């Protein structure tokens, strides 16, 4: 059965700290074109590879990968909130198949997803519940993290299952590219911050608002050039995007975690979601990919990109 891929960056800062109106309009135009492609494809299932930003996954138990058999979007920043229409039996079968392929993936029957997943669904489908969806969490901010090779192999295992599922499937990668927003780290954290990173589920509205305000303030400082955050790296971004487009996906295996942090920033590890999505597509055979948009957007603290792809035989 057919498969289609859409990969896109996300930002919680849209509407809080925005670039010039013409840049926002171009991003919205590109996302509208992606929605049109998805609408025409009319998927019977959407699989979203997405990170989390210490909103649903914490250091009490931090898996490298997790498949959601039931999931709720928490609605952080201005993202959509509510229950995702997850086909639980299919998600369970997916988890069993992935584990049979020697990829140790966790399973959640109460997954919480944040803007990293919800914004992608909103951008591509207009809602959380237009199509059945299986969220696949990939740890991208909380060391230790799996390698890009493992993310690729996760995607391959997911893709092999999907190719036998008898459904039109949209695979989505949400995250990246180069960026380093102010995500706290466990190493060297105060007792209060450490507790939030270990067991910070369901914070009070005041606590969530304070955290979001810190992110907005960091973006304003980043734009003003008064920030210690890692600079955006368009050259690195474009090299990564070109690698995906080339079809030589195994080349990502040589990208180490230390090199990703050094060149792209601490949150550039979200490229794992793109690698996994392309890994799923590649399980169907050779593909052709198009880069629809790329721009370094300081206001959103992100190298911002959109790609789509499909099997070469289509």
UniProtKB/Swiss-Prot annotation:
Keywords: Aromatic hydrocarbons catabolism, Dioxygenase, Iron, Oxidoreductase. Gene3D superfamilies: LigB-like. Its cofactor is Fe(2+). The keyword Mitochondrion does not apply. The active site is at 115 (proton donor), 179 (proton acceptor). SUPFAM superfamilies: LigB-like. The keyword Amino-acid biosynthesis does not apply. GO terms for biological process: 3-phenylpropionate catabolic process. InterPro entries: DHPP/DHXA_dioxygenase (IPR023789), Xdiol_dOase_suB (IPR004183). Its EC number is 1.13.11.16. It comes from the Bacteria. Pfam families: LigB. GO terms for molecular function: 3-carboxyethylcatechol 2,3-dioxygenase activity; ferrous iron binding. It is an enzyme of class 1 (oxidoreductase). It catalyses: 3-(2,3-dihydroxyphenyl)propanoate + O2 = (2Z,4E)-2-hydroxy-6-oxonona-2,4-dienedioate + H(+); (2E)-3-(2,3-dihydroxyphenyl)prop-2-enoate + O2 = (2Z,4E,7E)-2-hydroxy-6-oxonona-2,4,7-trienedioate + H(+). Pathway: Aromatic compound metabolism; 3-phenylpropanoate degradation. Belongs to the LigB/MhpB extradiol dioxygenase family. Catalyzes the non-heme iron(II)-dependent oxidative cleavage of 2,3-dihydroxyphenylpropionic acid and 2,3-dihydroxicinnamic acid into 2-hydroxy-6-ketononadienedioate and 2-hydroxy-6-ketononatrienedioate, respectively. Homotetramer. This is 2,3-dihydroxyphenylpropionate/2,3-dihydroxicinnamic acid 1,2-dioxygenase. It comes from Cupriavidus pinatubonensis (strain JMP 134 / LMG 1197).
